[in-house]
Amino acid sequence: MANDGNGDNNDDPLRQYLMNPRINPPPPSLLTLPENNDVTIPMPITPLELKNRLIFGSFVRSRKESSLPIDALSQNPSTSSSATTSFSDSTDLLLPLTEPNKPVRKSKPTINFHRSKTAPAMAAINNISHPNDPKTDQQSDSKTIVNQAVALLVVYLSLGVLIYWLNRDSYNVKQTHPVVDALYFCIVTMCTIGYGDITPDSVVTKLFSIFFVLVGFGFMDILLSGMVTYVLDLQENYMLETARNESLNLNDRDKVRSYIIDVKKGRMRIRLKVGLALGVVVLCLGFGVLIMHFVEKIGWLDSFYFSVMSVTTVGYGDRAFNTLAGRLLAAMWLLVSTLAVARAILFLAESRVDKRNRERAKKVLGESMSISQFLDADIDCNGCVSKAEFVIYKLKKMDKITEKDINPIGFQFDKLDRTNSGRITLLDLLESSTKDLPTATSI
């Protein structure tokens, strides 16, 4: 392609292309067959161009997308422009034949939008809509209950001591100290033990005792649901965190830990709760035996008998605390021991219910579905049972949920589903966040 003598390469197609780049014109709708001209061999397309053609449809190769060597080699100065343009772009062979005199439509690239699960904007939206952390709210609520329980306990005991102090002559009692006797009387009355060593002897004190007993029932429930539950939850969370953070390599220790703590479900096993509660009861019994034997100067058998009667709130009245130190220690011991026994009884009942629920769940999951059960599980009556319907049906059979539990959830779903399409979209959620929704629905 080079000229002789002067070395002028003006006829070199590659040099001409680099000095004066061009963009190939779009090919005609019908390809003309070259007859008198030279036929140029179409150059193969690159894999990237083939991928773009399959994804975005037909396109005209631009100067940036075209390969310089391919366009330069495909240019032949001895041939006519019609033959060159007919086979200049090999990708045009993929185009289907169209009708004559009809312009070729360029298909627009299809853009599909997909939600990114790692998009940080979703976290910002969630923070705006739900700024509070449920765990933080639950901990703050528990602390609030504990503070209220402590305040009510102080008010209850202070009021009882004040009334006893003002009417201390209206009680049949072996007096030691008015404040200690009043505190001892309030604790014994609130715990419903009733030794009979301190009894009211006037109208005012009897009315006060009636009021004090009735209020004491409700107050014991507050203590059980508030302070004791909070302390046990703290202990459970501490043990769970310790079990998660420990790196134990021994299989035997792993088996013991899995037997005591269910790390996967994030809770203590009910057998451990019952064992701890019974252990606390045994400690309370032992502490009571020591108080009665060394302080009240009672024999070991009578001390154990009196301790059991006191912890279980039976209180026959044949024994009682008569010394100042004994009544002062009994005021603290009886409050803790009666709460521990009540909690142990609740854990025992919970273990029985948990065992019954496990047996029922095992039975429900083991049985096959009959035609009548299929019809019951088909909630929307469309002739088929979806996975959600199957799960709801099985949970109902296990007595884990009822219609009263499902209806409020469905009512809240209908409020979020603005378009009644049977599904909640992000647009529906953003629209509903601007309006006040009930945080809880009464069941």
Curated annotation (Swiss-Prot):
Gene Ontology CC annotation, any one: plant-type vacuole membrane
Lineage of the species this protein comes from: Eukaryota, Viridiplantae, Streptophyta, Embryophyta, Tracheophyta
InterPro entries to which the protein is assigned, alphabetical: 2pore_dom_K_chnl, EF-hand-dom_pair, EF_Hand_1_Ca_BS, K_chnl_dom
Listed name of the protein: Two-pore potassium channel 2
Binding site for Ca(2+) 1: D378, D380, N382, C384, E389
Cytoplasmic topological segments: 1-144, 229-274, 349-443
Cysteine-cysteine disulfides: none
Coiled-coil ranges per UniProt: none
Domain of life: Eukaryota
Gene Ontology MF terms in the entry: metal ion binding; potassium channel activity
Gene: TPK2
